Regions:
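Short, Lys/Arg-rich, polar N-terminal cytosolic tail immediately upstream
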Residues: 1-11
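Membrane-water interface segments at the C-terminal ends of transmembrane alpha-helices
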Residues: 9-44, 53-166, 190-215, 219, ...
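The alpha-helix within a helix-turn-helix
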Residues: 176
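Juxtamembrane non-transmembrane "cap" segments at the membrane-aqueous interface
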Residues: 219-228
């Protein structure tokens, strides 16, 4: 048994590599998360509950969650369409379009926020068109927040679904077509079940990123308490007031929400994979 266990450790320096990995993860992830708990411990349980459930904080939760959810649903649809076009069609400028998907990753979020704000204010061409034609204001409203979150979240869906579409075997689609299945039926019953786990993963990552987004939203949100104030901005306001205990308490709630989202994502992906495999 001892010899067998030794053979399993095929990577040279396994102990050292594992130690370095744990140290890096502790420095980057575990220690900062523990610091949130330590700072929030300065409040009593009653003070903690009062802080994280105050009307202004609850209103910021509502704005953050609703706009993040709306943007992520839009990204799920748009991201699937963009990934489908990039994989299934050939057209001039395809590589340029494919590369532009990465722009939200590379572009500083503050730059994105400023650009979106200038593009959607009532004095701009686009913002003025929606304002005067439809009576819709984009900048400094929840619509503007959603637009910013769509911008920063769509690459997560596209890059999650695109590799799966590229690896799909076209023989199944051909067989369905030969058997008389329509394109819509083939997509719903052949293609969509295969890409569903990737779509769920992309949606969840976009939602988690949108929930904590600050830089691109702060300029276009308007930041009006109870209306367009997002939770990350409220946390920043508490820090500027040197109210570190309240800031970390609110951040701890957002952290718990993020972990819950990741847990739900793992469960949904597992169930989707089992359904596709015919286990359930």
């Amino acid at each position: 048994m001892k010899q067998r266990r030794k053979k399993l450790r095929v990577i040279p320096g396994f102990g050292l590599s594992l130690g370095i990995t744990v140290a890096i993860l502790s420095f980057i992830v575990i220690i900062p998360l523990c610091s949130l708990v330590v700072f929030s411990a300065h409040l009593s349980p009653a003070e903690f509950i009062q802080t994280v459930t105050s009307p202004r904080v609850l209103a910021s939760y509502k704005v953050s969650f609703l706009t993040a959810l709306t943007a992520s649903l839009i990204n799920a649809v748009m991201g699937l369409i963009v990934a489908w076009v990039l994989v299934r069609y050939e057209f001039p400028g395809k590589r340029i379009l494919d590369g532009m998907i990465e722009v939200p990753f590379a572009l500083p979020t503050a730059v994105a926020g400023i650009a979106l704000t200038h593009m959607t204010v009532d004095t701009s061409v686009i913002g003025g068109f929606f304002h005067h034609t439809f009576g819709i204001d984009i900048a400094y409203t929840r619509t503007g927040i959603t637009l910013a979150l769509v911008f920063i979240g769509i690459p997560f869906v596209v890059r999650s679904v695109q590799p799966v579409l590229e690896k799909l075997d076209g023989q199944f689609e051909e067989a369905a077509s030969i058997l008389g299945a329509t394109r819509g039926y083939t997509f719903r019953h052949v293609i969509f079940p295969e890409i569903l786990p990737a779509l769920i993963a992309g949606f969840t990552m976009a939602f988690a990123r949108s929930l904590g987004e600050y830089g691109s939203v702060v300029f276009i949100a308007g930041n009006t308490p109870y209306e367009t104030e997002i939770t990350p901005l409220l946390i920043m306001s508490k820090l500027q007031e040197f109210d570190y205990a309240s800031a970390t308490s609110i951040a701890l709630v957002m952290l718990a929400a993020a972990f819950l989202i990741l847990l739900i994502n793992a469960v949904l992906q597992s169930r989707s994979s089992k359904i596709i495999s015919g286990i359930e």
